[in-house]
């Protein structure tokens, strides 16, 4: 788990605003997410859960905790049904591209949508 204080969100918003947050926590597994949730208290509120930051407009520093998932991975659960499981930190457009490369069609119209899967 990556836990930082007074963290710049410059690389986490597509508007490119150089704002900071009081605390930034990035988890990369379900277990880390569970540990994080168990450790949160009132000083972390209001929580802000972000993905790629494409729908995020912060004009000033965020006074609390920002949470970001870095869970990666893609797996086919049922090829015949086109059922895929992916980590919440995967970039959505990359999932669409991956699906096409693996002959799993149907999500093509969702291409070029910014953001991450679990945002």
Labelled PLM ranges:
Residues 1-119:
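Anion-binding (especially nucleotide phosphate/pyrophosphate-binding) glycine-rich loop
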């Amino acid at each position: 788990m990556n836990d930082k204080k007074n963290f710049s969100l410059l690389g986490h918003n597509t508007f490119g605003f150089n704002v900071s947050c009081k605390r930034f926590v990035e988890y990369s597994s379900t277990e880390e997410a569970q540990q994080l949730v168990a450790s949160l208290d009132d000083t972390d509120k209001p929580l802000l859960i972000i993905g790629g930051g494409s729908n995020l407009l912060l004009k000033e520093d965020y006074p609390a905790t920002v949470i970001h998932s870095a869970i990666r991975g893609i797996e086919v659960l049922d090829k015949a049904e086109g059922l895929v499981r992916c980590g919440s930190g995967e970039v959505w457009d990359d999932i669409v591209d991956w699906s096409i490369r693996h002959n799993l069609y149907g999500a093509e119209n969702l291409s070029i949508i910014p953001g991450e899967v679990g945002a």
